[in-house]
Amino acid sequence: NEQIVINQFPFTGKMEYWTKPGFNWQWFGKTTTYYKTNQVWFNNITTTDKGELTTYGLDNPAFPITYADKGKGFVLGSVRIELPKTEAHLNLIQEHYGSEARLLEELIKPNIGKVILACGPLMTSLESVAEKRNDLIAYATDQLNNGIYATTTKTVEKRNAITNELEKIQQAEIVYDSNGNPKRNEEGPFLKYG
């Protein structure tokens, strides 16, 4: 069984959460289904008549990103989401969102976009496709699971890969606690929902 079914009984409003396959009595209740796992895509991008890149009006639009050197781009890819199977977490999800579509559109996709925006200032655009490419993935995954990093900004000199000239840029750095763990500006919302 690839779905979780939430059944809300009439009159009492009591909810049951069916996470395992098998026969269950619905008793005229209203059911809502969620996939146990879901792949969230953000891979669509197109060009305008003027030749500019855009994601406007597309299904599954790529997320914009701005790097420390003010380079701009889009992040394309996907994230696998796995729903919790505990009643407490499923109850929160159902009460706050009420459907899989709202969960994806109002919690998951906006938070993926927020995390990608937060990753940009941690590196230059060239670093994002070279030596820090894997860091970008690790930063995004960690922030999705645990919350947005607290950062400080420092002026650093970097050699421009195209002009070979030294440039001063504002680059964000992660703030760490005394145990060497990243400090967080906010707790990740996925922690609350399991």
Give each language-model segment a name.
Residues 1-115, 188-192:
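Hydrophobic membrane-anchoring helix/hairpin
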Residues 66-69, 74-75, 103-194:
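Amphipathic, coiled-coil-like alpha-helical scaffolding segments used for oligomerization/assembly
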